C-alpha cells in the first residue's frame, strides 16, 4: 500500500495586504490561472508577490498584470523566464460580464487579493473594489488600533 502524498491544499501562496487597506471590497471572485511549468514550481516554493498588481479586462478576457513570480534557477534553465509577464485569468463568462459591467462604472476596479492552492491547482482570489479616500484609510487604522487595545485589556484582565 502506498503512502498518501502530503498535499498543501488550501494553503495561501501570496497575499495582497495593500489592496485590503487601499480599497473597499465590493465582491470577491475565484479565478484560475494559466501558468507555465517553471511558474508552478516557483509558486510551490512561495516565490510570488502581488503588491501593485491589478486585473485588466480586455476583449472579454481577464489578465493579471504586475504579479511578480521569481523564477527558480533549477526550474527555468531551458526557458527565458519573464517574472512579470501578463497571465490569463480563467473565469466563467457570466463572472466576466459582471466584472466588465461593474468596472465600466466610475470608481470601480478589479485587483487580486490572494494566490492559493485548491487541490493541485493555483487559484487567484480577485475582488471588485472601490477606492478609499484618505480619511477612510485613517478610520480603518484607528479601528485596528482600537481592536488591539481591547485585546490587550482583555488579555491583561484575564491574567489577573
UniProtKB/Swiss-Prot annotation:
GO CC list: cytosol
Main localisation: cytoplasm
MF-aspect GO terms: RNA binding
PROSITE patterns linked: SSRP (PS01317)
Localization: Cytoplasm
Sorted UniProt keywords: Cytoplasm, RNA-binding
CDD domains membership: SmpB
One of the GO biological process terms: trans-translation
Pfam families: SmpB (PF01668)
Gene3D superfamilies tied to this protein: 2.40.280.10
Positions of the UniProt region annotated as Disordered: 134-160
InterPro entries on file: SmpB (IPR023620), SsrA-bd_prot (IPR000037), SsrA-bd_prot_CS (IPR020081)
Similarity-based family: Belongs to the SmpB family.
HAMAP family, per database record: SmpB (MF_00023)
Summary of the function given for this chain in its UniProt record: Required for rescue of stalled ribosomes mediated by trans-translation. Binds to transfer-messenger RNA (tmRNA), required for stable association of tmRNA with ribosomes. tmRNA and SmpB together mimic tRNA shape, replacing the anticodon stem-loop with SmpB. tmRNA is encoded by the ssrA gene; the 2 termini fold to resemble tRNA(Ala) and it encodes a 'tag peptide', a short internal open reading frame. During trans-translation Ala-aminoacylated tmRNA acts like a tRNA, entering the A-site of stalled ribosomes, displacing the stalled mRNA.
Protein name: SsrA-binding protein
